[in-house]
Amino acid sequence: MKTLYSLRRFYHVETLFNGTLALAGRDQETTGFAWWAGNARLINLSGKLLGAHVAHAGLIVFWAGAMNLFEVAHFVPEKPMYEQGLILLPHLATLGWGVGPGGEVLDTFPYFVSGVLHLISSAVLGFGGIYHALLGPETLEESFPFFGYVWKDRNKMTTILGIHLILLGLGAFLLVFKALYFGGVYDTWAPGGGDVRKITNLTLSPSIIFGYLLKSPFGGEGWIVSVDDLEDIVGGHVWLGSICILGGIWHILTKPFAWARRAFVWSGEAYLSYSLGALAIFGFTACCFVWFNNTAYPSEFYGPTGPEASQAQAFTFLVRDQRLGANVGSAQGPTGLGKYLMRSPTGEVIFGGETMRFWDLRAPWLEPLRGPNGLDLSRLKKDIQPWQERRSAEYMTHAPLGSLNSVGGVATEINAVNYVSPRSWLATSHFVLGFFFFVGHLWHAGRARAAAAGFEKGIDRDFEPVLSMTPLN
């Protein structure tokens, strides 16, 4: 493809490393980028960039398959998943594969199949990545114009956006079909402590689905993270899938309007920055979801949430002391508030003590004991079931607190188990990665805007001290 502008003019930031290390097309002289700038060398080589992306997808899918099989090989059915450091099998179990009542694993074969399918897929992607990176055409515009593009071709860019949106919409519908037709998904709220069930009565009311988006993100409200029934989750995927598919068709059929052409920067680096910004939002949202939500991330597989473990401890000692003769309705604690039960700011009966801060927790083992005004004293005296006691004792000793060296659990709880909860791992990793992606978004957005405006801030690369130093090799 003929270059329509001077590389020097377009790639504002040049950092000379050592031009003698590389071949033509891969060195600084011919691309304007040093070897470590990675895919920046491929900005105008659509064929090679395709290879890089397909190979990257292959690495991702290879990790998924290999890690999946690793978890299957190490899995012990007698222990809960969250005690074994698993992060992939809980996702498969949540989708209803291999589990039965109470989240008990009945069959690990579906997990094995999942791992093998991902490994085989990664081999196909890996071959495609190597082919396009090394053997295929450098640019696709001449031989395969449908797959070719120029970054500033606004119509082509929105067509590619549309194709991506349609694929995302189909992905959302995969969950819908699994929940509706292919065996159902795991519902932690099923009576008696959770079970796999088909979700038949979807929530499609726009006021409910979009009402989540309008909620406050703070305690008691919790934005979309507060979703607590599968009908809403699956119904939300119907809405999301439909919007993505319709939006994708719209973007394929239309050209950007004048206001959009003016508002956006239309370059490869700008698109990179938009994508990184979106992924940062996904990362932060996923962090909050896995930390607080025990419906999309059932506690049977991921362990209790922090508030859940705390409330479970209060419940466990209420049960114990009630058996020993305490009157849990009137016993006073050291601060003058109720020792076992007290009232929330809005008048509900809640657990007393330090766990009062988590009074708005909802959990399947606790909800049967609530009445119209919070915890029901008569139910606490007469209706507590053995499965509720067992589960709360288990969750009390598995709080999602823990450091990298696995000293987990509540420091003052002598029965706590030494482990790190998958909720801790997943929330921390998604927060940290989301933050890094956000910084990458700011970095690339700044560069893209500076390039579009025709200036850059930074040191003058022509007189950089390193240029007068001896090459490293």
UniProtKB/Swiss-Prot annotation:
[CaMn4O5] cluster binds at E367. GO terms for cellular component: chloroplast thylakoid membrane; photosystem II. Its main location: plastid. One of its GO terms (biological process) is photosynthetic electron transport in photosystem II. InterPro entries: PS_antenna-like, PS_II_antenna-like_sf, PSII_PsbC, PSII_PsbC_sf. It is a multi-pass membrane protein. The modification Phosphothreonine is found at T15. Residues 1-14 form a propeptide. It is found in: Plastid, Chloroplast thylakoid membrane. The chain crosses the membrane at residues 69-93, 134-155, 178-200, 255-275, 291-312, 447-471. Binds multiple chlorophylls and provides some of the ligands for the Ca-4Mn-5O cluster of the oxygen-evolving complex. It may also provide a ligand for a Cl- that is required for oxygen evolution. PSII binds additional chlorophylls, carotenoids and specific lipids. Keywords: Acetylation, Chlorophyll, Chloroplast, Chromophore, Manganese, Membrane, Metal-binding, Phosphoprotein, Photosynthesis, Photosystem II, Plastid, Thylakoid, Transmembrane, Transmembrane helix. Belongs to the PsbB/PsbC family. PsbC subfamily. PSII is composed of 1 copy each of membrane proteins PsbA, PsbB, PsbC, PsbD, PsbE, PsbF, PsbH, PsbI, PsbJ, PsbK, PsbL, PsbM, PsbT, PsbX, PsbY, PsbZ, Psb30/Ycf12, at least 3 peripheral proteins of the oxygen-evolving complex and a large number of cofactors. It forms dimeric complexes. This is Photosystem II CP43 reaction center protein. It comes from Ipomoea purpurea. The lineage of its organism: Eukaryota, Viridiplantae, Streptophyta, Embryophyta, Tracheophyta.
